[in-house]
């Protein structure tokens, strides 16, 4: 009897596995189970079906082995950047560009893209335009490629400033440029190149928002169109956290865009992109996009640009993103808007969108959201790891009366927040109370109790200093807790009053050993640096604190972390010229070891020790001028110390003019005369530039 005809088992199994794999990949596009239904009906998916997918992308060819070897060596040379002269590097770059001619697409879509990124970083405006034109017509495929997407991102960032430069300078000869050597070359402005690129992506924006590689490039392009500054890589929503940072040794290659003036065509294109990105998408799918790991950050950026560039009145436009997300007026429990807000508060992705809404929403809308969902819940929300950041954004928009009410709720939760090491809401609360002139006494009382030790308030508990026992720790987790603790301590010191004095007193009472440990700790030392240059630090505190390091300055100057504390001591010795000279003497005693160390050489330079060694009198005169011509004042009244010590920051170390010094000394003399009931005695000290005699130096 004939058997039923069947296909071979292995081929059928392979097809079945392929179908299962495709289904599984599709279901992973959204991370929430309730969004799986979106895959079948989401309009974004229909757009994606029409767009070129990665498995159907054109193949641009491969480099042969000889070309790969050449480009690999060129990449290594550019990474090291050890050319004898700029001219040598220019010649080398010209030869690499010549070798890459006609191979740009092959390089961009392979591992050689690293070299192409470095070439873009060092390219001239003409070279950027040429590469733009080589990529033209292929951008839709390139932005979806694992390697080429990074090249596109770098190209956009490097080319963006040229748009503003072209528009700033009126070039009447722009259209009359002599023909280039290449008859096929098209002369076009950088502005039009960006617009042509956007035209290629038009109709696919919805799909690209959730594409693994293209979503990051799309965000960069949106920022460029808006003229907004591009945030640093560590905190930016425009770049992938997994992106390899391609750098050039010794070059200023931080790809940061400052705020720029962009042409009107860019703003028109941006408005069209914002409109096209959500047009035709039902509200249900748009809300699902809010918690998508790739689409969520893109939606945040679109919403931010919509409200900041086209007016908050856009909230009334039914086609706007903010109205599509929150259509109900008023927003009340049970409405679709309420369901969305309650769902975003505790979501790791969606909470960022809620922060954007709170930060940029019109005042009337913000008051509705705050009064309906957050006014009575500020304390409980602050305890949550995710919702705590939403609380921080809310605090930034509250008026004085609402802030006082929110403070009362959050203050009750401070012991719980400290126990859970969630100090970010406390830090923001202190900052806003200072800005709104709200009394911080309740916060001070709770923090003093929460961080109490055998000797009262202990700053080491905030900084987690005693927990460093030399054991290896995870990169994140506890290190983040230390960072947040350090930021809290620094914020407390900005408060002029009992709250800030908690930290200053605790630091001043540390033992010399613990002070050295504090200076050597990479995170905790930032608190010490901030304390030394704080405008609220008294002369008494700075003197006591710096004395803890006597005899150890040479060691600290050689430590990569503690060397920053030594630099801060220079600014911390304003009004303490004798101590500044004492520190310089210790540095001079350790000259050999400092000169042999890269870290030590920086400290030596910052303290101007070459001048100290060669012309000590000039150094002393300059040091005393910047440290205060009144030189060292021993044990001034605590009430006057804040007045006597000028504001000290790393930026504000300017020289005081003669008239300013005269006024300062006259005020100090009058205050002393009023207190003692007699005129100050005149000595034989040399006079300053104002003709007044400074007080004598008091030895320690």
Curated annotation (Swiss-Prot):
InterPro entries (UniProt xref): ARM-like, ARM-type_fold, NOP9, Pumilio_RNA-bd_rpt
Superkingdom is Eukaryota
What keywords are annotated for this sequence in UniProt? Nucleus, Repeat, Ribosome biogenesis, rRNA processing
Presence of the UniProt keyword Repeat in the record: yes
Annotated GO MF terms:
RNA binding
SUPFAM superfamilies reported for this sequence: ARM repeat
Per the record, its GO cellular-component terms are: 90S preribosome; nucleolus; preribosome, small subunit precursor
Pfam assignment, any one = PUF_NOP9
Could you tell me what this protein does?
RNA-binding nucleolar protein required for pre-rRNA processing. Involved in production of 18S rRNA and assembly of small ribosomal subunit.
Output this protein's name.
Answer: Nucleolar protein 9
Its source organism is Pyrenophora tritici-repentis (strain Pt-1C-BFP)
The gene is: nop9
